[in-house]
């Protein structure tokens, strides 16, 4: 089923994007705190 493959890869892609967004938020917050401390 090409459908199933598409849906699976798409959901995996969505998960990756969510993880990247989360990491960007965490790293951004940490970076801002470090800058404020200097």
UniProtKB/Swiss-Prot annotation:
UniProt-listed InterPro entries: Glucagon_GIP_secretin_VIP, VIP/GHRH-like
Keywords attached to this entry: Amidation, Hormone, Secreted
GO CC terms in record: extracellular region; neuron projection; perikaryon
Subcellular location: Secreted
Coarse class of the protein's main subcellular location: secreted
GO molecular function: neuropeptide hormone activity; peptide hormone receptor binding; pituitary adenylate cyclase activating polypeptide activity
BP-aspect Gene Ontology terms: adenylate cyclase-activating G protein-coupled receptor signaling pathway; neuron projection development; neuropeptide signaling pathway; positive regulation of ERK1 and ERK2 cascade; regulation of protein localization
Modification Lysine amide, positions: 38
Any Pfam family the entry gives: Hormone_2
Similarity section: Belongs to the glucagon family.
Function of the protein: PACAP plays pivotal roles as a neurotransmitter and/or a neuromodulator. Stimulates adenylate cyclase in pituitary cells.
Name of the protein described by the UniProt record: Pituitary adenylate cyclase-activating polypeptide
Native source organism of the sequence: Uranoscopus japonicus (Japanese stargazer)
């Amino acid at each position: 089923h090409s459908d199933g493959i598409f849906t699976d890869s798409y959901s995996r892609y969505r998960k990756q994007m969510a993880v990247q967004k989360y990491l960007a938020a965490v790293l951004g917050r940490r970076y801002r705190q470090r800058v404020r401390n200097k």
